[in-house]
Structures are given as C-alpha cells and as structure tokens.
Amino acid sequence: MLTIPEKENRGSKEQEVAIMIDALADKGKKALEALSKKSQEEIDHIVHQMSLAAVDQHMVLAKLAHEETGRGIYEDKAIKNLYASEYIWNSIKDNKTVGIIGEDKEKGLTYVAEPIGVICGVTPTTNPTSTTIFKAMIAIKTGNPIIFAFHPSAQESSKRAAEVVLEAAMKAGAPKDIIQWIEVPSIEATKQLMNHKGIALVLATGGSGMVKSAYSTGKPALGVGPGNVPSYIEKTAHIKRAVNDIIGSKTFDNGMICASEQVVVIDKEIYKDVTNEFKAHQAYFVKKDELQRLENAIMNEQKTGIKPDIVGKSAVEIAELAGIPVPENTKLIIAEISGVGSDYPLSREKLSPVLALVKAQSTKQAFQICEDTLHFGGLGHTAVIHTEDETLQKDFGLRMKACRVLVNTPSAVGGIGDMYNELIPSLTLGCGSYGRNSISHNVSATDLLNIKKIAKRRNNTQIFKVPAQIYFEENAIMSLTTMDKIEKVMIVCDPGMVEFGYTKTVENVLRQRTEQPQIKIFSEVEPNPSTNTVYKGLEMMVDFQPDTIIALGGGSAMDAAKAMWMFFEHPETSFFGAKQKFLDIGKRTYKIGMPENATFICIPTTSGTGSEVTPFAVITDSETNVKYPLADFALTPDVAIIDPQFVMSVPKSVTADTGMDVLTHAMESYVSVMASDYTRGLSLQAIKLTFEYLKSSVEKGDKVSREKMHNASTLAGMAFANAFLGIAHSIAHKIGGEYGIPHGRANAILLPHIIRYNAKDPQKHALFPKYEFFRADTDYADIAKFLGLKGNTTEALVESLAKAVYELGQSVGIEMNLKSQGVSEEELNESIDRMAELAFEDQCTTANPKEALISEIKDIIQTSYDYKQ
C-alpha cells in the first residue's frame, strides 16, 4: 500500500485550498466589475430586498443557528437577526454610496464614492447569522462583493443566511457571485482568503487571535478587540432600572454579545439594595465555598480565559457543571469578588450569564476598578455607568479607555447602537488603538468605501487692511485735538524727537484739547530697536496704563511702539511665537491677540518705512542680535497721521535711504505673489512719485518734494501691508544688521540685482493659488512702461528698469555696492553663507514671485558686493 508522507499530503491540501480561494477571488473580481455598473437606485433596491428577505427568515435562521451551535437563546437570536436586517437597513438606506455623493460648492469640493474591492468577511460562532446578514448588507450597499469564512461550528446556519440574502439580491437584479463563502471551512482556508491578493479588505469579527491575523495580512482590516465591560452603579443611580438593564443585557442570548457586562461595581451605600434587587429577579449569588468550583468549571486550566464549551450556555447548565445547586428558574449567576486581575479569574470576559460583583468604598475606587477591568482584557471596547450625576457621567467618560461609554444603558444592546442611543447600529464594534484596532467606532457601510475628493482650484480669500483713519496734508497733526477718548497718552520715540522739539509739538497740540490729557514720554528707542528696549518701554506703559499710544519717529520708533503695544494689550504674548515665519497670515501658527484697550497712533517723521499703515514691526532679538519681522494684523495701527511738517528737516542721507526703501516697498509689492487689483495701483503711484520727487527731495528738500515722498511712503506702505514684500527685504534685514548698513540703503544696493534675478525664468516656481503663472518679468516691464523707460522687448524693459533704479540710487548719493559701505571681502566670505540662510528663513521670502534657493540668494549678495554699472 502506497503511503503519502504527511508533509507532502499537507502541501497537496494547501494547493487544493489555494485553487478554491483563487476561484472565489476571480468570481469576486468579476462581480465587482458588474456591481460597478449599478446605479445608486439599483443598489438600494437590491439591499432593500436583502433586508426584507432576512426579516422574513429571521426566525428560521435563528433556529438553525441555535440548533447548530447549541449556544445562546433561540428567541434572542431571532431578535439579533431582526436587528441586523431592520436596524442596519434603516441606518444605511439613505447613505449615498455610488458615484458623486456630495458637493460643497463654496469650498469647491466634490466627493466621489468608490468600492473598496472584494471583501473577506470573517464571522463568529456567537452571532453567526446576524453577523452574516449585517456584513453582506453593508458590503453590497457599498458595491463590494464579499467572500465569507464562516466559523466551522456555525457553517451551515451562516451559509443559509448568506443564501437567503444572495437569492433576494439576485432576484432584485444583482449579478451572481456578489456573496460567496468557503464551502469547507478550515483555518488554512481562512488564512489564504484573508491574505489573497484579490482581497481588498478584511472585515473580521471573532476571537483576538483571528483579529490579529486579519491585521497581519498587510492590507486594510477592520477587526475588533475583545470586551471586558465594567458597569458602575453609582449611589445616585435609579436602582431598579439599572438592575433591570444589566439582567436583560447579561442574559440576552446567554451573554454572548461581546459588549455585555462582565464586572458590576456598586457603591457601598447602595450595595445591599442592589444585590436584593438582583435576588428578586432570579439571580443566584454564589456562596464563598462555591466560588472555586465556579472558577474551575468555566475558566481554563491556566485561568487565562473561559472554556470554549461554556460560551452561550445557560446559568442553570453552568451551575450544574460547577456542581452548584440553583433554582430551576435561575437566569444569572453572580460571583462577589473583592478585586480585578489575575488573582480574580472571574473578572475576565465570560461570554455567558455569569457576572462578577465588586463593592466600591468610594467613587474614586469604583473608577479604578472599572479602569482595571478594561485593562484586564477589554481595552477600547465598552464601559457603562449608571448615575444621575451628569458631571460624573462626563468624568467617567474622560477616564475610561473605552470607545463606547454608555450611560444608564444595558451594555449588550446599547453598545451595538441605535436601540438605546444614537450610536451607529453595528455588529462589529471598533476598539481603537486601545484594543489594537484601526477604528474606534461602530463599523458601518461608510467604512467600506474609498472617498475620492475632486478639489477645484480656489484662491485664498485676501483682505485689504489699513488703519481706520489716515490723516494727511500739512498740519494733519491737529486731528489729535478732536479724536475721542484721549486722556492718558504715552509717546514712544527716539532721543532726537525730544532734542529737535517734535515731542513738544505733539504735546502742544494735545494740550489744545478741551480736557488736557496726562502725557508720558519714552524716548529711548535706538535704531534697529531691540527686545530689551521694548521690555523697558513696556514697563513704563504697564505702570502708566495709557488709553492712547503715539509712536513718533521713523520706522524704529513705530516698530518698537507696536511691540510694546502688543505686550501691553496681551502680556501672555510670546516673542518666540510672534517672530515665527508663516505662509498665510490668516493661518499662522501663532496668533497675536487683537488689541482691546489702547488706541495706537503713528506719526512718521521719515518717508520710508510705511510702518504707520502696516501690520509689521522689525525687532532685533537682544540675545542673538538677529532682526525678526513680526507680522500680524493685530499690529495694524488704529490711526496714521501723515503730516509733512515732520520731514522737512530730515538730513539728505536719511532722505535718500528712506526714499529708496519706499521704492523697494512699491516694486516688491507690485511683483509679489499676493499682489492684487487693490494694491498694484498704490504700488505704481508710489513708484511714480519716487522717480519724480526723490532726487529733488534729497537735493533741495523743498516742501512739495518732501510732501510727495511722504505720501509715496504711505502709499507703498498700504500696498506692501497687504501684498507683502520679497527677497530684497529678506536680504536687507540680514546684511543691514550684520554690516551696519542702513536698511533703505541696503535695499537700494540690492534692488537692481533682485529685479534681474526675479525677471529670469524660475528654477523653483512660487506656489500661491492667486499667482497662476510666473509673471515677474512682465510686471517689471509694465513698471518700466509706466515710467516711460525705453525697451522693445520684455527683457530690454526689465534691464532699463534695473539700470534706472541703480542710477536713481547714485543720483541721491548712495554708493551702490556693499564694498563701498565698508564691508571687507573677508567679512563677506565669513558671513555670506549664514546671511543667505537667514535671508531664506525671513518672512518676506514667502511672497517673492519665485522661490529663491539659498545658493541663489548667496549669488545676489556676492554680485552686489563690488558691482558697478
């Protein structure tokens, strides 16, 4: 007689199984394609007929399951089948699962549903027919064929449930093979099905070992963890209702629902009343000398889990196995234990009408016992509290590591959802990361879809924000006499404002008010104001508590005053947070609180920074000596007073430097990725005024030229306040501080090279929704045309503009390279790499019309070192 070696025989069986699984998967793939051609209406009709057929056969299927498994209660299984068909259908019937399922026109989003693919459905012996109905319905509702691996001990009843819904589906127009199953169940067959390349997702319900296998397939899996449900009856609970809920829940189908109560914790104050109520309803309390017998009867030898044969048996059957005499009408066995954990085996999940009871000496102890119960094999599943104290209900929910925290509810039927609460109805309950699951909610049809999003391009909403009031013309300072609520004024300025009598001018105007305000002056602002100066001024501000802050001076005074205002209004503000870079000012990671108390007024005494109308302030960190541009709409002044009388005596060199700063503001804001119809006109007018009046403003210092440049400064400020700047400012911020070059002069030196750089086709394109294509070259050409410069091509116009900027700088006395500013070649070589990196990090870089690489920034700095035109 020929004997086949065991190993070879095993290999042959595995091959047979593989052939079978391949055939099922191939049919499933064809069914998937056929289902994809069905409309939403056709799918809904098919699933509705499946649910009706399951309702019609719910008693027959329950009887089959009860007879085949020998577990649970026939009548309860019938209810579960009815729930799986009726409640599930009611929950999913209106779900859109085919094609376009939603549209948000405002956001430009269209949602498209597509099936996951062929699903492997694994079902348990505890709820065989109801789980089959449930999984088949949610699979077909979402256009997914399903192949079942039934539990061997419930193969025939599960198979019949699948046949019932499949026959109904096909009569309703469904293609064949949308529901299939393994005919000869085995661990090997289930394993091969779960791991088959044709399976898109594993939908697993069963023991922890099987669920773990599902998650180890390397493909999406929806599996659930085991339950070990604590139920806390707190002293304010409605005792009769709580006991009724627990008895009904724990005895339902002989405790086989994984969400059923396992350990009941009772406050000592009501312990006797609760136990008496249990006894009044045929619950048997195990005597001390019977406890060990009960443990031995239902727990395995290692006391690490329940014996499989015990699952779903009646209380009387279990008592008989344990040798414990109980009345014939006993419906529940209760074991009083004093703790939870391995020393108390009955505190584990029991899946039978056996309940552990623990007396709690306090709410704190009760919470701890419930928490320990979850950690003892039930993490993530379900926890219950019976109490009338709403605060305690929330505290319990916050404390327990359970994805379903039920209040005043029978756990078994509460956890599955929709009967006692608004949880999604389901027979597969996710336990989240606590239970090593991928989901934390009740599984339903929406979990079996790929949702595609068609996202239309949209521009970010932009805002044009400037001070609420801008006063201009000579003697605009007189507006201070009529403004509301000026009672305590703090003037922030540099020492020169006091020395040259400007603060006195402001004081004299303020004293013309009907009620003269109190006035304090902080006059210690230095060029490039530091955090130390800001904090010093803040100290005076906090002590004085002004209702009005007046920043008088150039950019340094206004920037320092803005920072003081920021900290004064919101002391919790962090300079570290405020200095951080952002891509979108409306989405910035760190928000500066909007001011609520003091009115902030800016009176510029130079024509350059535009700070009087911008949400920006440049502050130097005293610890690192690095300049940081702060940017937030909270820093926008309330009032700007543009009075040319304050700039008539500004020295020529300062007028030249600040004038070139105006030009840089205007040009960078014009080509910025955030430039808009609201800003470009301001930019162009500022450019025009600068080219027309800067030279005479420097050389002659006449009233008309100075006033025009003062206006140009504010126009450019309004433009860049809303369109932002670019890498000229990014670099100038860094090299100005490093080499001691005035900010406007640094911009003047850099601007011609920035124009040429930005006008070349980018190596890295800028990314901003409104900036639809690279246009910096034509933008610069448009500026050149506006100024009447010569050029027959875009390139020629760009070059004319760069040369015109260089010549304007020279004409006002600026040496247009870094070397002429006293920067040695040694200094440059030592710092250039660091400067380039810091410039890239600068806030202004993000709005540049093309993304600048650090190497390119370095080249710009190098070129500007000894450049001559």
Where in this protein do the model-derived segments appear?
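Glycine/threonine-rich beta-strand-loop-alpha-helix active-site module
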Residues: 96, 161, 532-645
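Gly/Pro-rich interdomain helix-loop hinge
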Residues: 738, 744-830
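Rossmann-like NAD(P) dinucleotide-binding subdomain of oxidoreductase/dehydrogenase enzymes
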Residues: 100-241
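N-terminal Rossmann-like NAD(P)+-binding subdomain of aldehyde/semialdehyde dehydrogenases
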Residues: 2-110, 138, 280
